[in-house]
Design a protein with these regions (language model features):
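Extracytoplasmic gate region of multi-pass secondary transporters
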Residues: 2-6, 184-222
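Symmetry-related core transmembrane helices of the 12-TM Major Facilitator Superfamily/SLC fold
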Residues: 137-156
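Juxtamembrane intracellular "pre-TM" segments in multi-pass secondary transporters
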Residues: 164-190
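Intracellular juxtamembrane helix-capping segments at the cytosolic ends
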Residues: 87-101, 211
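Glycine-rich segments within core transmembrane alpha-helices of 12-TM secondary carriers
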Residues: 106-132, 146-147
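C-terminal ends and interior cores of transmembrane alpha-helices
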Residues: 56-70
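Central cavity-lining transmembrane alpha-helices of secondary-active solute carriers
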Residues: 25-40, 227-239
Length: 242
């Protein structure tokens, strides 16, 4: 959906380019800002309940986004997706952290990151023919179907790790966040890395529109953006083992 979100907001919903970019930017920022807090909540209720909630929110959000492409529905749907996605990030990283040892943790996270990029690669691979043959709305229904399947699989096969009641309170999490942003060296590093992410996210914010407007509607920004996840999923485990 990332690869099509600004296209969908402007071409289907009716936002202009600037508003669509702002909405997409806030959506992406929320996905990365919320995990410390949704992760604390996931610790409290248990990872299994939290991931079921997450996939439920994602299924609802994607379906509403595709079924009712009007501004009054799309914006709340994106908020639902933002919270659902932020749960996934924190739960999966938490599961890896709690089910690996110091010796296996690096390998565990590399496998997790590799699988994330397998999903990113396959998602954009299917998004291209869906966009051409059935339109941008179909990508949302495809995403809703995939998250619904994930919800069913999680319900039957995901075993909870021992997380209930172990998490920190939201107050403690917020205090930790304040300590982080007052660490000058870390903040400088974050700003440096942020420069990279600003450029990288243009693959989703502006590149699709640029390619389609300059090359034509038959062009494939999806495959251009696929270079990144392809390189990651084929090299991350190997590099980690070096």
């Amino acid at each position: 959906v990332f690869i099509a979100i600004t296209l969908y907001l402007s071409r289907v919903v009716g936002f202009n380019d600037i508003d669509a970019a702002w909405i997409g930017g806030v959506f992406s920022a929320g996905l990365y800002f919320l995990p410390p807090f949704t992760g604390a909540f996931a610790d409290k209720i248990g990872f299994r309940k939290a991931i079921i909630l997450a996939f439920g929110l994602l299924t609802l959000g994607y379906f509403a986004l595709g079924a009712m492409p009007v501004k009054i529905v799309v914006l709340p749907s994106l908020v639902v997706l933002m919270f659902g996605g932020s749960f996934i990030k924190s739960i999966i990283t938490g599961t890896v952290a709690k089910t690996t040892t110091e010796l296996t943790r690096a390998r565990g996270f590399s496998i997790f990151y590799g699988m994330v990029n397998v999903g990113a690669f396959l998602g954009k691979t299917f998004a291209y023919p869906l966009r051409l043959n059935w339109g941008l709305q179909s990508i949302n229904f495809y995403a809703a179907a995939m998250t619904l399947i994930a919800l069913v699989l999680v319900y039957f096969f995901y075993k909870n790790v021992n997380a209930d009641g172990e998490g920190k309170s939201l107050k403690t999490t917020w205090e930790g966040f304040i300590r982080v942003i007052t660490n000058i060296r870390l903040v400088v590093l974050i700003f440096i890395v942020t420069g990279f992410w600003i450029i990288q996210h243009q693959l989703y914010a502006t590149m699709p529109k640029y390619v389609l407007r300059t090359v034509g509607e038959g062009a494939s920004p999806e495959w251009i953006a696929n270079v990144n996840p392809f390189v990651v999923m084929t090299t991350v485990v190997i590099i980690t083992s070096l």
